[in-house]
Amino acid sequence: MAALTAENFAALQSLLKASSKDVVRQLCQESFSSSALGSKNLLDVTCSSLSVTQEEAEQLLQALHRLTRLAVFRDLSSAEAILALFPENFHQNLKNLLTKIILEHVSAWRAEAQVNQISLPRLVDLDWRVDIKTSSDSISRMAVPTCLLQMKIQEDPSLCGDRPSVSDVTVELSKETLDTMLDGLGRIRDQLSAVASK
């Protein structure tokens, strides 16, 4: 994620017009969300609370959004690391206030970002049963044991629209396929253990 530009830092100076620290805190909190950038309501609140034009409010909200996202993206959790984002000539008191606010909220923002990120489908539930499948070929009829694997898969809700985000998938596995799959899963488990122990 790219660092903030000089224009972003210039836009942040509009926060000096805030009547209290709580106004700055509220704007920081509300501007983190991606949906905040298109929010007419937040834009109007920013205009009225800071007495700025719509264009200035929009630039400020974009700058706050980038600043808070950058702190989360870079996993900044110390005052020194956050202060280093600002240029030397940035207003000292505002720099300290923004740093304090970011430190207060960075954990919650990180959790929110993880929840809202677009992700691969997730396995929610797994069940299985063993059945005997009657098979016939040209030589003889025979009973073949098979495993029916029933999985509940959760898609990313933001990508599903009106469709339900959880779907059922049933897979039939022969003994040979199951052996191959279990062998592969065993290797995956060993690799995950090796990575986790580093």
Swiss-Prot record:
The modification N-acetylalanine is found at A2. GO terms for cellular component: cytoplasmic vesicle; nucleus. InterPro entries: COMM (IPR017920), COMMD9 (IPR037360), COMMD9_N (IPR048676). It holds the Pfam family COMM_domain. GO terms for biological process: sodium ion transport. Keywords: Acetylation, Cytoplasmic vesicle, Ion transport, Nucleus, Sodium, Sodium transport, Transcription, Transcription regulation, Transport, Ubl conjugation pathway. Residues 122-196 form the COMM domain. It comes from the Eukaryota. It is found in: Nucleus; Cytoplasmic vesicle. The keyword Acetylation applies. Coiled coil: none annotated. Its main location: nucleus. Belongs to the COMM domain-containing protein 9 family. Component of the commander complex consisting of the CCC subcomplex and the retriever subcomplex. Component of the CCC (COMMD/CCDC22/CCDC93) subcomplex consisting of COMMD1, COMMD2, COMMD3, COMMD4, COMMD5, COMMD6, COMMD7, COMMD8, COMMD9, COMMD10, CCDC22 and CCDC93; within the complex forms a heterodimer with COMMD7. Interacts with RELB and NFKB1/p105. Interacts with CCDC22, CCDC93, SCNN1B, CUL1. Scaffold protein in the commander complex that is essential for endosomal recycling of transmembrane cargos; the commander complex is composed of the CCC subcomplex and the retriever subcomplex. May modulate activity of cullin-RING E3 ubiquitin ligase (CRL) complexes. May down-regulate activation of NF-kappa-B. Modulates Na(+) transport in epithelial cells by regulation of apical cell surface expression of amiloride-sensitive sodium channel (ENaC) subunits. This is COMM domain-containing protein 9. It comes from Bos taurus. The lineage of its organism: Eukaryota, Metazoa, Chordata, Craniata, Vertebrata. The gene is COMMD9.
